[in-house]
């Protein structure tokens, strides 16, 4: 190997110094402009998170998962359009998963993002496109329609299986019908991208990129009384109406939570009346929706097994379950695009009500 020039040695030394300073959160590489020190136990660096360890008992992280669950597989996806399997992850994402240059902190160039249903979006902001490369979901209106094609709307079919939109599909929520990741009912109109104020119109405008934590101080500039994450539930935006039908207009997060509760109850009632066995949801284990064999309204440990996964889906039930799951998988949905989430929940309830088997009363509810 030829000897390095003086200039090459200087650049190499500088790179090592900056990288070391970055890793320990000190030195010139961690200036005010570069943000706070990296916290290696949160968000993208949550080394013990299940998102990085679900495959510890198998040889490698499968190619279909490695883009977003490998340590540094995003660059491979951006270059090749697909991934190879990844090695097990020890410390969350590597810095090079998002940063193309560790001296300048430049991120990879992402001109556009293709969502699961085939729709392509350019947010106009490179870092947002980079975030949406993973935060987009894995199923869509198209995949649900493909699964239920040709089937009677209210007839159980054991060939139907739960379709999981996946975790934190915030990009899909924000772009609404432009991405069509949630299930959109035929002959219904849905909102597209939620256009927020300029300083909070990007992913990193609202979230610390390493930890995902919300920049609460940005919210309080326009919304009075917002000092903590809990206060966010009071934000109403400009949307008017009593969406959940409880007789009062509340913060969008509360309206959404109430509609989620109503939809979940309707799903359970419909499943019992049409499928013969009620369905219930748990976040604890895939595929999350199981048969509630003892009819106590929840999934107990002995029910949480693949042999007990719910197998009496009708097309109507699958649609509603998909949208309920979408709404809970994006805990920030009220702020990413609250109107879109409310439309999904309302339409899912309305569909179940039309069956006459879900015990749903739509009176008093308003569709945004």
Residues covered by each model-derived region:
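Bacterial N-terminal signal peptides that target proteins for export
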Residues: 4-15
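Bacterial N-terminal signal peptides
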Residues: 14-23
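Sequence context of c-type cytochrome heme-c attachment sites
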Residues: 27-208, 367
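Mature extracytoplasmic or organellar-lumen-exposed domains after removal of signal/transit peptides
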Residues: 37-41, 230-233, 241-368
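Short, solvent-exposed secondary-structure capping/transition elements
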Residues: 76-78, 107, 143, 214-215, ...
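Divalent metal-coordination and catalytic microenvironments
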Residues: 130, 222, 348
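Short, well-ordered loop/turn and helix-capping segments at boundaries between secondary-structure elements
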Residues: 136, 140, 224-228, 354
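Structured mid-domain segments that build the active-site/substrate or prosthetic-cofactor binding neighborhood
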Residues: 198-238
């Amino acid at each position: 190997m030829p000897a390095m020039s003086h200039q090459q040695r200087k650049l190499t030394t500088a790179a090592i110094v900056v990288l070391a300073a970055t890793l320990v959160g000190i030195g010139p590489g961690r200036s005010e402009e570069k943000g706070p020190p990296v916290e290696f136990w949160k968000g993208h660096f949550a080394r013990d998170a299940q998102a990085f360890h679900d495959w510890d008992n198998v040889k490698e992280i499968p190619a279909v998962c490695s883009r977003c669950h490998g340590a540094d597989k995003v660059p491979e996806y951006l270059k090749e359009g697909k991934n190879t399997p990844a090695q097990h992850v020890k410390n969350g994402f590597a810095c090079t998963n998002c940063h193309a240059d560790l001296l300048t902190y430049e991120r990879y160039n992402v001109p556009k993002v293709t969502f699961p249903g085939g729709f392509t979006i350019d947010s106009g902001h490179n870092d947002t496109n980079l975030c949406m490369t993973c935060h987009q979901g894995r199923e869509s209106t198209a995949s649900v329609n493909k699964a239920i094609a040709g089937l009677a709307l209210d007839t159980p079919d054991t060939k139907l299986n739960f379709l999981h939109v996946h975790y934190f599909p915030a990009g899909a929520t924000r772009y609404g019908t432009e991405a069509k990741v949630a299930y959109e009912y035929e002959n219904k109109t849905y909102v597209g991208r939620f256009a927020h104020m300029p300083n909070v119109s990007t992913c990193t405008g609202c979230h610390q990129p390493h930890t995902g934590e919300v920049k609460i101080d940005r919210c309080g500039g326009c919304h009075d009384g917002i000092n903590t994450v809990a206060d966010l539930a009071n934000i109403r935006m400009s949307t008017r109406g009593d969406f959940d039908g409880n007789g009062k207009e509340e913060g969008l997060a509360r309206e959404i939570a109430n509609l989620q509760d109503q939809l979940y109850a309707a799903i359970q009632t419909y499943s019992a009346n049409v499928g013969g066995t009620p369905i219930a949801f748990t976040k604890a284990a895939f595929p999350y929706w199981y048969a509630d064999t003892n009819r106590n309204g929840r999934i107990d440990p002995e029910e949480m097994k693949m042999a007990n996964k719910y197998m009496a889906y009708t097309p109507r039930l699958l649609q509603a379950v998909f949208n309920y799951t979408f709404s809970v998988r994006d805990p920030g949905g009220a702020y990413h695009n609250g109107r879109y989430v409310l439309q999904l929940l309302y339409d899912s309830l309305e569909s179940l009500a039309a069956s006459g088997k879900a015990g749903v009363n739509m009176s008093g509810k308003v569709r945004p």
